[in-house]
């Protein structure tokens, strides 16, 4: 896996304009839709249990995000996820805040038990709690703590039979056998709500067009991080509001050549 072939996946996304079905949270819906549109994907936000199975069946990817968790959304996620599995549509899961409350943790463990996942994406604390490993968490945005992030990612990939993505200062992508670190991004991403949730949906767009899900995830993370770096270089002195707008611009403007030039990945296994 080299930077040139990784960089070409973004071109494939823009050529294919994949439909990404998001069952996401109320905080990030608008930002997620605009981010996917800027990238070149086609977002749809369909939540009603009466239509989610049908919508998921025709999507390029299904993204399940439990940020603002309610029983109605859990039911919709299960219906959509099982339909996606039946129709060979890749499912991505963002277990937002797993470990913060008993209900949230229960749902975060139940969904992977019921639905086959192509990718699970979260911070270290969230992924650790999904697989019942101890890790500190406070609220839904905690990701720091003590532990080996690569080992947690590999364990999650093995136990859930999926590609595990753990994001933080360094991002980890693994299927349990291949493990890659991505070192792109900028700290100001943490000052804009929804950047992690949007990232999961962006990975969904890449997974929709690249069936090697490790490669797709690495490409998405590298693209996202490079776009953030470029946006920050133009706006960081102005603050997160200016960054958010410029970041959407860079999701549209960052090219495969930019990824080749600025991408920072390391294959560690």
From Swiss-Prot:
Residues bound to ATP are 121, 167
- Kinase: present as a keyword of the record? yes
GO molecular function list: ATP binding; hydroxyethylthiazole kinase activity; magnesium ion binding
GO BP, sorted A to Z:
thiamine biosynthetic process; thiamine diphosphate biosynthetic process
Question: What does the record give as its pathway?
Answer: Cofactor biosynthesis; thiamine diphosphate biosynthesis; 4-methyl-5-(2-phosphoethyl)-thiazole from 5-(2-hydroxyethyl)-4-methylthiazole: step 1/1
Q: Which reaction does it catalyse?
A: 5-(2-hydroxyethyl)-4-methylthiazole + ATP = 4-methyl-5-(2-phosphooxyethyl)-thiazole + ADP + H(+)
Name of the protein this chain belongs to: Hydroxyethylthiazole kinase
Provenance organism:
Bacillus mycoides (strain KBAB4) (Bacillus weihenstephanensis)
UniProt lists the gene as thiM
């Amino acid at each position: 896996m080299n930077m040139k072939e990784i960089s070409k996946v973004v071109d494939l996304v823009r050529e294919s304009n994949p439909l990404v079905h998001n069952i996401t949270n109320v905080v990030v819906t608008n930002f997620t839709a605009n981010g996917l549109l800027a990238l070149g994907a086609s977002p749809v936000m369909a939540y009603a249990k009466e239509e989610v199975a049908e919508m998921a069946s025709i999507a390029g990817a299904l993204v399940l995000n439990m940020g603002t968790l309610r029983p109605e959304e859990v039911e919709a996620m299960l219906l959509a996820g099982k339909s996606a599995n039946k129709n060979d549509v890749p499912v991505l899961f963002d277990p937002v805040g797993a470990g913060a409350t008993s209900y949230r943790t229960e749902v975060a463990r139940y969904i992977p038990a019921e639905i086959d996942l192509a990718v699970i994406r979260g911070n270290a604390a969230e992924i650790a709690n999904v697989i019942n490993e101890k890790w500190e968490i406070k609220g839904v945005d905690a990701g720091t703590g003590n532990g080996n992030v690569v080992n947690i990612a590999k364990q999650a990939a093995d136990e859930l039979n999926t590609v595990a993505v753990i994001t933080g200062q360094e991002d980890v992508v693994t299927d349990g056998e291949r493990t890659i670190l991505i070192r792109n991004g900028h700290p100001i991403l943490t000052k804009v709500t929804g950047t992690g949730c949007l990232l999961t949906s962006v990975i969904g767009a890449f997974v929709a067009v690249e069936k090697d899900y490790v490669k797709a995830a690495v490409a998405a993370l590298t693209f996202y991080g490079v776009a953030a770096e470029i946006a920050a270089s133009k706006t960081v002195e102005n603050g997160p509001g200016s960054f958010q707008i410029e970041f959407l611009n860079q999701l549209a403007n960052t090219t495969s050549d930019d990824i080749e030039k600025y991408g920072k990945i390391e294959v560690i296994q």
